[in-house]
Curated annotation (Swiss-Prot):
Component of the 9-1-1 checkpoint clamp complex. Involved in both meiotic and somatic DNA damage responses. Essential for activation of the meiotic checkpoint in response to double-strand DNA breaks; required for the S-phase checkpoint but not the G2-M phase checkpoint. Involved in double strand break repair by homologous recombination during meiosis; influences the organization of chromosomal DNA in the meiotic nucleus. The keyword Nucleus applies. InterPro entries: Cell_cycle_HUS1, Hus1/Mec3. It is found in: Cytoplasm; Nucleus envelope. Keywords: Cytoplasm, Nucleus. Disruption phenotype: Viable but females are sterile. Aberrant formation of the karyosome, the compact spherical cluster of condensed chromosomes that forms in the oocyte nucleus during meiotic prophase. Aberrant synoptenemal complex disassembly in the oocyte; possibly contributing to the karyosome phenotype. The karyosome and synaptonemal complex phenotypes are caused by persistent DNA double stranded breaks that activate a CHK2 meiotic checkpoint pathway. Activation of the meiotic checkpoint leads to defective oocyte localization. GO terms for biological process: double-strand break repair via homologous recombination; female pronucleus assembly; meiotic DNA integrity checkpoint signaling; meiotic recombination checkpoint signaling; mitotic DNA damage checkpoint signaling; mitotic DNA replication checkpoint signaling; mitotic intra-S DNA damage checkpoint signaling; nucleotide-excision repair. This is Checkpoint protein Hus1-like. GO terms for cellular component: checkpoint clamp complex; cytoplasm; nucleolus; site of double-strand break. It comes from Drosophila melanogaster. Expressed in ovary. It holds the Pfam family Hus1.
């Protein structure tokens, strides 16, 4: 069983760190699924607090890593699956936020315990030579017999999906609306309109976004709506550490809301907010 990956682009290193930092704010632990061409991070609802949603990130290896090698424990296995403290991994990667980082290696090792070693080559202002900053993050190797509990989630089939250009505005709005109602109703239609509705005993507050980009329409569907837990919605938006402003909101009527942030073409952060009974 072997895994080694190398990052060298400063922007890609910061994006990778921001993805892990987002997961850190949602749960203490996460799962890493290391494939031959793709890496996934998953935060399941049973790993997080009751107020956190299901979140996962898919990263195509060639986007971030000019060097990427994975060898599973057995020839018939396609992955290495690891359990890891998202907080510990986040702290190890925090060095990537600053300047002067030439490269960062990720390496699966067994020292006194299985670990992912984060090895950053950092230039300091007092020296022309780079120094290595090493963090060994303990991991749990999940055996193949348990993999069925750690499958990459399936993106739901949305009847309607809209692109929202201002993530910051929606984030601020949901943070306020969660104090009005325990649930939020999201309504979208083919006119490119999104309504976010919070209802209490005293009032109903409707916030409207218009002229949004229509990304998906299923058949002759004219509109779709779904109500979700306002705490879960707020937890997702509040955890985001990525600089991206664009967000895709897809609604699978009465089942779930799918939130998607395309960090770049083959690096995507997903969340599914399940419907609540009204």
């Amino acid at each position: 069983m072997k895994f080694r990956a190398l990052m060298q682009d400063p922007l890609y290193m910061k994006e990778f760190q921001a993805i892990v930092a987002t997961l850190t704010k949602l749960a203490k632990d996460c799962v890493m699924i290391l494939g031959s061409r793709q890496m996934h991070f998953i935060v399941n609802e049973d790993q997080s607090s009751a107020a956190s949603p299901l979140v996962w990130a898919g990263i195509t290896a060639e986007e971030y890593f000019p060097e990427y090698r994975m060898e599973a424990a057995h020839p018939d296995q396609e992955y290495i699956v690891l359990g890891v403290s998202s907080a510990n991994l986040g702290r190890a990667l925090s060095v990537l936020r600053g300047g002067g980082v030439n490269s960062c290696k990720l390496k699966l090792q067994r020292i006194q315990f299985p670990c992912i070693s984060v090895i950053a080559s950092v230039l300091t202002s007092s020296s022309t030579e780079a120094r290595e900053v090493v963090h060994d993050v303990p991991v749990t190797i999940i055996p193949g017999s348990d993999w069925s509990a750690y499958v990459v989630p399936r993106v739901p089939n949305s009847q309607l999906a809209l692109g929202l250009p201002s993530l910051r505005l929606l984030k601020s709005l949901i943070d306020k609306l969660k104090n009005i109602s325990p649930s939020l109703e999201f309504q979208v239609n083919v006119d490119g309109e999104l309504n976010v509705i919070a209802t209490s005993e005293m009032s109903t507050v409707t916030s409207r976004f218009q002229k949004l980009l229509i990304r998906t329409v299923s058949g002759s569907q004219q509109e779709a709506s779904c109500s979700v837990d306002s705490r879960k919605a707020s937890a997702f938006f509040g955890a985001l550490q990525l600089p991206n402003e664009e967000l895709t909101i897809g609604i699978d009527r009465e089942h779930s809301i799918h939130l998607q942030i395309d960090v770049r073409q083959d690096v995507v952060l997903h969340s599914i907010l399940p419907a609540v009974c009204m």
